[in-house]
Regions:
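General beta-strand recognition
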Residues: 15, 39-40, 71, 117
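A short mixed-secondary-structure module that forms the rim of ligand-binding clefts
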Residues: 32-66
Length: 130
């Protein structure tokens, strides 16, 4: 899982796909953080992505660095504990101008039943389950 987090941080931006009814929705994201042995992302409760994940937690992310890409699929489960939100914000100080652990808006989700697949045109697939 650390390899997945490292890749996502190096990529800087990845794309998160969710479903809104039968319509896929994709948007750029930039947070990836390991807390208590789980890979977390962060968003705001006022955003459509939050509502989509609450209705259907199945999601997939995709990131690319040069000729290698990573896809992570699984369920994103909200962790409503303050310490989980604060850990994310501590790892991403730039978010603290927009979010706080106690603002009622900050939300963090962790991957459950996840499969990460590293791909490239030159190497065999590498699969990590967590």
């Amino acid at each position: 899982m650390e390899q997945v987090e490292k890749f996502l941080k190096e990529a800087d931006v990845y794309y998160l796909a969710t479903m809104e009814g039968d319509q896929p929705r994709v948007r750029p994201f930039g947070t990836a953080h390991i807390f208590e042995g789980k890979l977390y992302i962060q968003t705001g409760k006022v955003k459509g992505v939050y509502k989509q994940l609450k209705e259907n937690p199945k999601a997939e992310i995709c990131a690319c660095i040069k000729d290698q890409w990573l896809r992570v699929s699984g369920e994103l489960i909200e962790d409503d504990r303050r310490e989980a939100r604060q850990s994310m914000l501590d790892d991403y100080p730039s978010l603290q101008s927009m979010y706080s652990a106690d603002d009622g808006n900050t939300a963090v989700f962790y991957f459950q039943n996840a499969t990460a697949v590293f791909s490239s045109f030159q190497a065999e697939l590498e699969v990590i389950k967590f």
